[in-house]
Amino acid sequence: DRVGIAVKDGDDYKLFTGNQTGALLVKFVLTMKKDTLNKKSTLVKTIVTSELGANIGRKFGLQIEETLTGFKYIGDKINKYEQTGEQEFVIGYEESYGYLVGTHARDKDAVVSSMLICQMASWYKNQGKTLVDGLNEIYDEYGYFLDYLDSFVLKGKDGAEKIQNLMTSFRNKGTALFDGIEEVIDFSTGIRDLPKENVLKYIWKDGSWMAVRPSGTEPKIKVYYSIVDASKENAGKRLETIRNEIKSIINA
């Protein structure tokens, strides 16, 4: 149900993240469907998925909707759209390599996604380009997005208590956690029409963000980062600084 891709780049291979593949698919699918898109056309992504694909969708005039983590919530949106007729699902995806184009399923679909990735690679090849070139074109147009996920394992009763205490600490710090944060979204309070979930999202003025949540299936606390910058080098330096600070907080 998931699909990842590796693209030959010179003498090496580049492994794409789920966010990168998602952004490429969004651009390709919307380009192919541009004559059939309308004001109801909608892209759905999870709250911990990069804004890059969403920004591409916005440029094509799509509505953007977010769900909690888990593809079942994207499936729920499709059901809702079919019942109300107010929106039309075009594409949905999440950072963990799950994609769905069309309404034939209510879960991530690696079969159709793999077919589309092959078509997309052929489309770029016919232009004398690779998927790496396609991704770089997206960065040139929308800015560089550097996404990363850290998972911290905290086992046992003490670990569970520490996870709870960490979430309380992050919640209390609010915008003071880092310089430049202009908004903190606490999904445990019920945001928009989303179910309540123990997730905190910190958003910087430049559109960069960080999200913190306990794993629902393992003794882990997960930290998602999405850094936006004009250059890959600056994004990398900034990510390293933020990650080191978060590590010091969690490992204290």
Predicted regions and their residues:
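Active-site beta-strand/loop architecture of penicillin-binding DD-peptidases
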Residues: S226
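Phosphate-binding and adjacent anionic-ligand microenvironments
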Residues: I5-K14, M32-R213, K220-K222, S231-G236, ...
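Oxyanion-binding/catalytic loops of NTP- or PPi-dependent enzymes
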Residues: D1
